[in-house]
Amino acid sequence: MAKLYFYYSTMNAGKSTVLLQSSYNYRERGMNTLILSPEIDTRFGSGKVASRIGIESESVSFNTSDNLLNLVRNETRINPLHCVLVDEAQFLTRTQVRQLSDVCDDLDIPVLAYGLRTDFQGNLFEGSEHLLAWADTLTELKTICHCGRKATMVLRVSESGQVIRDGEQVQIGGNERYQTVCRLHFKEAIYQRAEDELPLLDSNEPRQSER
């Protein structure tokens, strides 16, 4: 029986690169793949998945109201499909995650989903939350923080480089808006008060980083 796979990570771990390589491996063997990408992500143009190392492929865009089971079923009426790959899977809805599981169970087509686990506040995305619960296989794609530790979190930053703590969960951007960090540096950036927020700059109370 086909399985639902979820490859998760923070940003800059090569998720899209792995997706494109997986699709290439299928196609090299004469098999057909379908790449899905959320229409909200237009960093590289509509209907396209691209990696930071310069490779790209066309994709079929979807939005949160689309029925992905029906979308895939319609594609199989044109050509047989051997694998479905989903980029930026954190933007899936709970219902769409279930529909992808139906692609595996009803159509017997494996689904490989790639996405972020948590947002800039350390909270799970809707799609990631339900993929973590429903996927048959979970795989973490790893990258590193500037300190050398494994990076598991992401910070949203302003144009001036200041950490943004509040705002909408979804805001499309790349390295100019987000920084990949370990849990320690995430907590320091999010929870430690900036100097200009301290009530008394000459207070003898030690800062968190000095404790």
From Swiss-Prot:
The UniProt keyword set, sorted, is: ATP-binding, Cytoplasm, DNA synthesis, Kinase, Metal-binding, Nucleotide-binding, Transferase, Zinc
Name assigned to this protein? Thymidine kinase
Where found in the cell?
Answer: Cytoplasm
NCBIfam families in alphabetical order: PRK04296.1-5
The GO molecular function terms of this record are: ATP binding; thymidine kinase activity; zinc ion binding
Q: Which InterPro entries match?
A: P-loop_NTPase, Thymidine_kinase, Thymidine_kinase_CS
The UniProt annotation places ATP binding at S9, T10, M11, N12, A13, G14, K15, S16, D87, E88, A89, Q90
Q: Which domain of life is it from?
A: Bacteria
One GO cellular component term of this record is: cytosol
Q: Which family does it belong to?
A: Belongs to the thymidine kinase family.
Please write the reaction equations for the catalytic activity of this protein: thymidine + ATP = dTMP + ADP + H(+)
Q: Where would you say this protein principally sits, based on its record?
A: cytoplasm
Enzyme Commission designation: 2.7.1.21
The entry marks the following residues as binding Zn(2+), namely: C145, C147, C182, H185
- Which HAMAP family does the annotation name? Thymidine_kinase
Quaternary structure and partners? Homotetramer.
Picking any one GO biological process from the record gives: DNA biosynthetic process
Write out the catalytic residues in the record.
Answer: E88 (proton acceptor)
Q: What is the lineage of its organism?
A: Bacteria, Pseudomonadati, Planctomycetota, Planctomycetia, Pirellulales
ATP-binding as a keyword of this entry, yes or no, is yes
What species does this protein belong to?
Answer: Rhodopirellula baltica (strain DSM 10527 / NCIMB 13988 / SH1)
Q: What class of enzyme is it?
A: transferase
